[in-house]
Amino acid sequence: MKEKIPFYNEKEFNEMMKKTKKGTFSGWYIINPENKSVEFSGNFNRQFKLNKPVIPVNTEYVTRKEFNEYKDSNDQRLTKIENKVDKLEVKVDKLEEKVDKLEAKVDKLEEKVDKLEAKVDKLEEKVDKLEAKVDSGFEMLAKILAAINKRLDSIEGRLDKIEPPK
């Protein structure tokens, strides 16, 4: 089983080894000068573990080459993703322009519709006025026809009273 037991520096590791002469370590360790830590991978005997309690991490040893390959593949994936995002940004910008143009067209069409509605309203008013005039004209014609019918009836009555010549 491979375990990683971190120490903050090489001095701490050496002091730990002096304190625990019973403990042994077989494996490797890397000193990282950037964050001043030491990484270990290997086998520690039980006595060493008792004197330096840590939570064991079940990991596999990864070489620098494998790590760099993994990092490169991740960089390539990130580059592809960034390129796709850039392309999508361009497409979104184009779509935004199209939407703006369409909004302008819709505004123009709304103005035209408003104008046409105003014209239709005016025409409806004119039609209502004409209907009123036609209705009043029909009423007048009906009155005139009624008057003419009365006159015809009276004329027929007079004609009936007149005796035809013999």
Curated annotation (Swiss-Prot):
Q: What single Pfam family name could you report for this chain, choosing any that match?
A: DUF16
Q: Which family is this protein grouped under? A: Belongs to the UPF0134 family.
Name of the protein? UPF0134 protein MPN_138
Give the organism the record lists.
Mycoplasma pneumoniae (strain ATCC 29342 / M129 / Subtype 1) (Mycoplasmoides pneumoniae)
